[in-house]
A protein has these predicted regions:
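Non-catalytic propeptide/linker segments at domain boundaries
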Residues: 282-378
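Amphipathic alpha-helical repeat scaffolds of TPR domains
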Residues: 74-91, 120-133
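Serine-dependent carboxylesterase/thioesterase catalytic core
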Residues: 112, 131-205, 383-389, 418-423, ...
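Non-catalytic protein-protein interaction scaffold segments in large eukaryotic complex-forming proteins
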Residues: 130-133, 154-158, 162-277
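Short, surface-exposed "cap/lid" segments of acyl-processing enzymes
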Residues: 368-408
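Bacterial N-terminal signal peptides
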Residues: 44-53
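Bacterial Sec signal peptide processing site at the extreme N-terminus
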Residues: 53-73
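Helix-turn-helix repeat elements of alpha-solenoid scaffolds
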Residues: 96-107
Length: 502
């Protein structure tokens, strides 16, 4: 095509036809211009790039309250999966939950050697991974290997709690510390229960008269003592340990416990409360005392604790102690105050025995018997509970449990429950119950100087209420003088009556 005259190019219609845009000055059109035909053809591609660049890589979705709590607090103990904190730590070493669980030794080694994690992150994650291994092993894993894994978990949890830069009080409101505390408590519980299961009926022999013991399991040497817990029949070690968390009781309105450090256990020294020997002495200590066990790992530094395969286990009476020293830190002692009492009731056989006694068919309990619900404490006053007609100590199920569960009452009182045959006359039971209580006190406090031997509290229901009143009353010689006046007894007859009636 022939080129058009330049004059025609000054016509705006020319620019519109040929794809040019004029730049207009105040007086005339200039010759400055640029071609846009190619730009217009590229415009769709540019627009697509801009739209794609506007799509965010992160999408926001609403999370329900339940899912929020599960994400924040879910871990190997609650969901069976690793916690969000553990997963985040694994990402630092270039791993994830699936790959880590496929090769746990390599995963733990990577966590242990990395410099990209703080001590708290590394120790808490290793505690969770060892616990995961112990739980997933189940019956397939050898018993000693499983116990080793639980002790490893307890060791790393112990190091996290007491041997890192921050103290437990500085992490008091953190969810992760609560999780790691639970790893420690659960791992100590499972390790001890498994060890005692292996020695069921034949517990490890004490090394001395103080109840110190030592045994070997896998790579670990477990030493410990139970001197802070009084066991029935002067036993130094229990026959069996039952996790308090595994017990659930129907008939009890509430179950009382205290949060803290340690494995909540029931130390079993006998199968039943009432046995053929129950009538030989007028009192019985509970064969199911509640105890709390803690594990200490020797060493003053993190490196020393992580390199040892020794552990010291100590049992405490949670009624007498509410805190424990751990690596220089005073930690609250965990406790379950309902577990021992609930198991005592469940294995007592009182209901059947009370009905048999009422109709004269009782064979084991034919006279009053005092039952101590806790190991004797000379520094706490005694509450004696007396049941009513055709009843038994089971009548006090929830009353006794509420006393045990109240911190103020628990700190100042201990409970004794009295079983007595309700088919006997009140006067006979009154005298027999008095004697049983006096003999019990004489056994535990021969000098009669302890606080527990004074200002005893009597609580009675129905016939037990009448007996409580009689035990607090004294007629002096009035009844004796009235009998002498009515019957005029003298000489041998009088002496015989005096010997018989006391």
């Amino acid at each position: 095509m022939a080129s058009e005259p330049y004059a025609d190019r000054d016509d705006p219609r020319h620019f519109r036809r040929n794809g040019y845009l004029p730049i207009v000055s105040s007086s005339t059109y200039t010759t400055t211009s640029f071609t846009v035909s190619r730009s217009l053809r590229c415009f769709p591609s540019v627009l697509l790039v801009l739209v794609l660049a506007g799509c965010a890589g992160v999408k926001v979705t609403a999370v329900s309250n339940n899912d929020y709590l599960a994400q924040r607090r879910g871990d190997v103990l609650t969901t069976g999966n690793l916690s969000a904190s553990a997963v985040a730590a694994l990402q630092v070493v270039g791993s994830d939950e699936k790959r880590c669980l496929a090769d746990l030794p390599a995963c733990r080694e990577a966590l242990d050697s990395t410099t990209g994690l703080r001590d708290e992150q590394r120790l808490s994650t290793l505690a969770e991974l060892w616990l995961k291994e112990a739980q997933d092993g189940g019956k397939v894993m050898a018993a000693e290997a499983r116990t080793d894994a639980y002790l490893e978990s307890a060791r790393y949890a112990y190091a996290y709690l007491f041997l890192t830069t921050r103290t437990p009080s500085q992490r008091a409101l953190e969810d992760r510390q609560t999780q790691v505390r639970d790893y420690y408590n659960f791992s100590v519980q499972q390790a001890l229960v498994e060890v005692f299961d292996r020695y069921r009926g034949r517990p490890p022999s004490p090394e001395d008269t103080q109840g110190n013991f030592r045994l070997k399991t896998g790579r670990w040497t477990i030493g410990g003592r139970m001197t802070d817990v009084r066991l029935a029949d002067d036993r130094l070690l229990p026959k069996e340990l039952i996790p308090a968390a595994s017990l659930s009781f129907g008939g009890l309105r509430n179950q009382y416990r205290r949060d803290g450090l340690g494995a909540e256990l029931v130390a079993v020294t006998a199968k039943r409360v009432v046995s053929k020997g129950s009538d030989e002495i007028p009192w019985s200590e509970t064969p199911f005392p509640a105890i709390t066990a803690v594990a200490r790992f020797p060493g003053e530094t993190l490196e020393q604790v992580l390199s040892t395969y020794q552990v010291e286990v100590i049992g405490y009476d949670p009624y007498r102690q509410d805190s424990v020293d751990m690596a220089g830190v005073q930690a609250p002692l965990a406790a379950n105050f309902t577990s021992g009492y609930g198991l005592w009731l469940a294995r007592s056989g009182f209901a059947r025995q009370s009905l048999l006694t009422l109709v004269g068919r009782g064979e084991v309990l034919e006279r009053p018997h005092v039952y101590l619900l806790q190991p004797f404490d000379p520094d706490r006053r005694i509450v004696v509970m007396l049941h009513g007609l055709a009843s038994s100590p089971e009548a006090w199920i929830n009353v006794a449990n509420e006393v045990l569960g109240d911190e103020e009452l628990r700190r100042n009182y201990q409970i004794w429950q009295v079983y007595y045959p309700t088919n006997l006359p009140l006067a006979v039971n009154n005298q027999a119950i008095r004697e049983a209580i006096e003999q019990t006190l004489a056994n535990f406090d021969p000098q009669g100087t302890a606080k527990a031997s004074h200002d005893m509290v009597l609580v009675g229901h129905s016939m037990g209420g009448v007996l409580s009143r009689l035990m607090l009353s004294s007629s002096g010689d009035q009844l004796w003088d009235a009998m002498l006046g009515s019957y005029g007894m003298q000489g041998a007859r009088l002496e015989k009556a005096r010997a018989k009636l006391g």
